[in-house]
């Protein structure tokens, strides 16, 4: 079972619809007894990092997610950023599952990074356009599987142990985005 974590700031209905379209059983919840049953946990998100972490803590989801670190967790957009240690957006601590700091995009191009952009990767399936909406980015590191070029290199997919972060919106990136979401659910992008 896949559980989409509901903390009140997310693109939940679109993500749920996309996962159902792929044929998976999916439940939306913020309850420990449901999250504990998940094989895969999806952390969606749209909005401000500090506000999201405040809600996650208010709902005790930080502790619940910390008890489920043996499971695959996929963060989408803000959800990816929340898995990091810290963000400059609101100077807030994250969940700390992936090492690094989230920082504002530094580019001569307009911010937010909004619209379609091509993925760059050594992975054979990660080479098409996907849909981005964000103003902050993860650091470039050995955990980056694919990135986009937007006046600077912006991590688009990261994988660290059983944590997968997807900065763009796979649920808004057409058939190709669904293929990426399926690959993330099935095991990720390392050692393919």
Swiss-Prot record:
Disulfide bonds: none annotated. The active site is at residues 77, 169, 171. One of its GO terms (molecular function) is imidazoleglycerol-phosphate synthase activity. It catalyses: 5-[(5-phospho-1-deoxy-D-ribulos-1-ylimino)methylamino]-1-(5-phospho-beta-D-ribosyl)imidazole-4-carboxamide + L-glutamine = D-erythro-1-(imidazol-4-yl)glycerol 3-phosphate + 5-amino-1-(5-phospho-beta-D-ribosyl)imidazole-4-carboxamide + L-glutamate + H(+); L-glutamine + H2O = L-glutamate + NH4(+). Pathway: Amino-acid biosynthesis; L-histidine biosynthesis; L-histidine from 5-phospho-alpha-D-ribose 1-diphosphate: step 5/9. It is found in: Cytoplasm. Its main location: cytoplasm. One of its GO terms (biological process) is L-histidine biosynthetic process. The keyword Signal does not apply. InterPro entries: Class_I_gatase-like, GATASE, Imidazole-glycPsynth_HisH. Pfam families: GATase (PF00117). The keyword Lyase applies. HAMAP family: HisH (MF_00278). Heterodimer of HisH and HisF. IGPS catalyzes the conversion of PRFAR and glutamine to IGP, AICAR and glutamate. The HisH subunit catalyzes the hydrolysis of glutamine to glutamate and ammonia as part of the synthesis of IGP and AICAR. The resulting ammonia molecule is channeled to the active site of HisF. This is Imidazole glycerol phosphate synthase subunit HisH.
């Amino acid at each position: 079972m896949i559980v989409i974590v509901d903390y009140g700031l997310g693109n939940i209905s679109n993500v749920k619809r996309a996962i159902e379209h792929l044929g998976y059983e999916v439940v939306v919840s913020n309850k420990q007894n449901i999250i504990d049953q998940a094989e895969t946990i999806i952390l969606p998100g749209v909005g401000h990092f500090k506000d999201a972490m405040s809600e996650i803590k208010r709902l005790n989801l930080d502790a619940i997610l910390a008890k489920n670190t043996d499971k695959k967790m996929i963060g989408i957009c803000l959800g990816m950023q929340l898995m990091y240690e810290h963000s400059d957006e609101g100077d807030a601590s994250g969940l700390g599952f992936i090492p690094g700091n989230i920082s504002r995009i530094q580019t001569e191009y307009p911010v937010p990074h909004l619209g379609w952009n091509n993925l760059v990767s050594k992975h054979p399936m990660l080479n098409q356009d996907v849909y981005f909406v964000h103003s902050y980015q993860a650091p470039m590191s050995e955990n980056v599987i694919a990135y986009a070029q937007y006046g600077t290199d912006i991590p688009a997919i990261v994988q660290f142990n059983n944590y997968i972060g997807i900065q763009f919106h796979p649920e808004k990136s057409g058939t190709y985005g669904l293929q990426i979401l399926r690959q993330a659910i099935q095991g990720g992008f390392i050692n393919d």
